[in-house]
Amino acid sequence: MRYTILTKGDSKSNALKHKMMNYMKDFRMIEDSENPEIVISVGGDGTLLQAFHQYSHMLSKVAFVGVHTGHLGFYADWLPHEVEKLIIEINNSEFQVIEYPLLEIIMRYNDNGYETRYLALNEATMKTENGSTLVVDVNLRGKHFERFRGDGLCVSTPSGSTAYNKALGGALIHPSLEAMQITEIASINNRVFRTVGSPLVLPKHHTCLISPVNHDTIRMTIDHVSIKHKNVNSIQYRVANEKVRFARFRPFPFWKRVHDSFISSDEER
């Protein structure tokens, strides 16, 4: 089994990485950061997001597993005191692969039709660079839906619906559903300006195209990466053809993750 371990970079996570690598030597597992079969994230959910983007070019060949060294994270299956058991499971069993939908974002520019493509595991958030009101036309399935005015828009995946989307009042969507969710960030609604004012859940075969009305620089935050874009003509969102693969060695149902992350106390776990 070829593996690689990515850490948060703090002393606790780095120490746990070295401990795991020593265990793995006993099982003759091969460290291979270029072509791993399994990527182990040690840290928090942010570390797993970084791991996802580092290996997003080979998603069909790699599976991810999270070990959390802080508070319980949403993508975590394992805690530090369980790593020896995890390594035994990796070595001795064929792991189950659970696939989650991803979000595809295509940025198109006014410069000769140039475009860039991104994948998001959690969400893509759009705001203006200078903090002014974002004014965009929202088109669904090729038809104009609304002109949005407000602080921004958040488009999330089902697994990402538990992150920023939840804080914005969006719905929680089970990741077995191939969908994306569009949630408003402080929209302007009065007698003159009007938006739908509710999160929109779109199925896989629907495309959302957003076109800036003004020529403001757009600040796009895709998961943990924030990039400013100039001369944006449109931003296209849809459920990606690719999926992220997680290695499962024991049951950890989605709704239990939600319960453990947002409802139960440490004493109840």
Swiss-Prot record:
Binding site for NAD(+): D45, G46, N122, E123, R149, D151, A186
EC number(s) recorded for this UniProt protein: 2.7.1.23
Catalyzed chemical reaction(s): NAD(+) + ATP = ADP + NADP(+) + H(+)
Subcellular localization, as worded in the UniProt entry: Cytoplasm
Cofactor: a divalent metal cation
Principal localisation: cytoplasm
Active-site residues, as the UniProt record annotates them: D45
GO terms classed as biological process: NAD metabolic process; NADP biosynthetic process
GO cellular component: cytoplasm
Taxonomy, superkingdom: Bacteria
Record GO terms (molecular function): ATP binding; metal ion binding; NAD binding; NAD+ kinase activity
Repressor keyword on record: no
Record's keyword annotation contains ATP-binding: yes
Keywords: ATP-binding, Cytoplasm, Kinase, NAD, NADP, Nucleotide-binding, Transferase
Job of this protein: Involved in the regulation of the intracellular balance of NAD and NADP, and is a key enzyme in the biosynthesis of NADP. Catalyzes specifically the phosphorylation on 2'-hydroxyl of the adenosine moiety of NAD to yield NADP.
Protein family according to the UniProt entry: Belongs to the NAD kinase family.
Name the record gives this protein: NAD kinase
